Amino acid sequence: MRVNFKVNGRPQEADDVWEGESLLYVLRERMGLPGSKNACEQGECGSCTVRLDGVPVCSCLVAAGQVEGREVTTVEGLAEYARHREDAHPGGGCASGACGTSVQDAQQWQANPEKGATDSQTGEGGGVFPRATLSPIQQAFIDAGAVQCGFCTPGLLVAADEMLERNPQPSDADIREALSGNLCRCTGYEKILDAVRLAAARQSEGV
């Protein structure tokens, strides 16, 4: 089976996909995107969270064939995704997710290397966007010290970014609910909550 879909804004084609193959396997083994982690393979831990047409999903539970013609955003694409939001809503603080991104916008999002955009798979590149630029939520996780072993971090980043996009001023209860599907054994969650609070505060201040 051949599957055509977009990954981080770039059209991709996966050949010889077997019927039971998961999106997680395709991303890691066929697309060379190891950010989404393979842990429980039962949709319990959230380490493999990606956005499918803008909606957070556990990629271990999504059959590869289900993404035909659809848009997938992984942790590797978060920085460019945030820049796309800012481009769509300039001056509104939307690089950190304040304005939201429609499914239509996500589906029309295209990497544009000739304008100096970063590589949409690795998040690296040059031109107008410095190499290895981070999204606001990624920077907040670093600044708040919210990373230890890092295995759960990609899923947490994707889930937190989506939550801040639709809810730019979340309460602690909102944050806990949004991240309830993401498990962490290291941090006790407090630093993770601090990071999301920090990202929310920065976007409300337009930082």
Describe the role of every protein-language-model region.
Residues 1-207:
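Signature of N-terminal electron-transfer/Fe-S-associated modules in redox systems
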